C-alpha cells in the first residue's frame, strides 16, 4: 500500500506543476504585444495575468529543482 507521505508528495508535486504551467502561460501572455486582444480584454484579466507572472518568476527555478530532485529520488527508490 501507499503511505500518506507518498500521497502527500504526489499531491504537492501535482499542485506545483499546475502552478508552474499556469504561471508560465501567464508569462507568455504578458510578453505578447500590448495591443493584442488578450491584454486589452479587461483590467481584471490583466491584473490576474500580472499576478501569475510574478508567481511564475519566483517559483520557476526552485520549482524546477524540487521537481527534478523528487524525480531523481523516485528513480533511486525503485532500485
UniProtKB/Swiss-Prot annotation:
The chain crosses the membrane at residues 9-29, 48-68. It holds the Pfam family Pox_I5. It is found in: Virion membrane. Induction: Expressed in the intermediate phase of the viral replicative cycle. Residues 30-47 are virion surface. The keyword Ribonucleoprotein does not apply. It is a multi-pass membrane protein. It comes from the Viruses. GO terms for cellular component: membrane; viral envelope; virion membrane. Its main location: virion. Keywords: Late protein, Membrane, Transmembrane, Transmembrane helix, Viral envelope protein, Virion. Residues 2-8, 69-79 are intravirion. The keyword Lipoprotein does not apply. Envelope protein. Belongs to the orthopoxvirus OPG081 family. This is Protein OPG081. It comes from Monkeypox virus. The lineage of its organism: Viruses, Varidnaviria, Bamfordvirae, Nucleocytoviricota, Pokkesviricetes.
Amino acid at each position: 500500500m501507499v503511505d500518506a507521505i507518498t500521497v502527500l508528495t504526489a499531491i504537492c508535486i501535482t499542485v506545483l506543476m499546475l502552478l508552474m504551467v499556469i504561471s508560465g502561460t501567464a508569462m507568455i501572455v504578458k510578453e505578447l504585444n500590448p495591443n493584442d486582444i488578450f491584454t486589452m480584454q479587461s483590467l481584471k484579466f490583466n491584473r490576474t495575468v500580472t499576478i501569475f507572472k510574478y508567481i511564475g518568476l519566483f517559483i520557476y527555478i526552485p520549482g524546477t529543482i524540487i521537481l527534478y530532485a523528487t524525480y531523481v529520488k523516485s528513480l533511486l527508490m525503485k532500485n
